Amino acid sequence: MELSAEYLREKLQRDLEAEHVEVEDTTLNRCSCSFRVLVVSAKFEGKPLLQRHRLVNACLAEELPHIHAFEQKTLTPDQWARERQK
């Protein structure tokens, strides 16, 4: 499976109706097997961190077996706005 930061970004944005998504390929040689993501979505409202991460994991269920390392940060739009003001 051919993975890229752009592919993951588009899928997360579409499936989670995210207002903001950042995906960084953190592999040393950029071989697309290690990623760090930030997802901002209203779908995370009222959900604890574990449920948010499960939503992201479910969205990327087909891709995760091909990824060696995956770090995620999940925020609601309000949390994202407060974080950007810091």
Swiss-Prot record:
Gene that encodes the chain: BOLA2
Keywords: Acetylation, Cytoplasm, Nucleus
Domain of life: Eukaryota
Gene3D superfamilies attached to this UniProt entry: Phosphatidylinositol 3-kinase Catalytic Subunit, Chain A, domain 1 (3.10.20.90)
Gene Ontology BP annotations: [2Fe-2S] cluster assembly; cell redox homeostasis; intracellular iron ion homeostasis; iron-sulfur cluster assembly; protein maturation
Primary localization class, coarse: cytoplasm
Protein name as it appears in the record: BolA-like protein 2
Subunit note: Interacts with GLRX3; forms a heterotrimeric complex composed by two BOLA2 molecules and one GLRX3 molecule; linked by [2Fe-2S] clusters.
MF GO annotations: 2 iron, 2 sulfur cluster binding; iron-sulfur cluster binding
Function: Acts as a cytosolic iron-sulfur (Fe-S) cluster assembly factor that facilitates [2Fe-2S] cluster insertion into a subset of cytosolic proteins. Acts together with the monothiol glutaredoxin GLRX3.
Residue positions where N-acetylmethionine is found in the record: M1
Compartments where located: Cytoplasm; Nucleus
Organism: Homo sapiens
UniProt GO cellular component terms: cytoplasm; cytosol; iron-sulfur cluster assembly complex; nucleus
Pfam families: BolA (PF01722)
Family assignment from sequence similarity: Belongs to the BolA/IbaG family.
InterPro entries named among the record's database cross-references: BOL2, BolA, BolA-like_sf
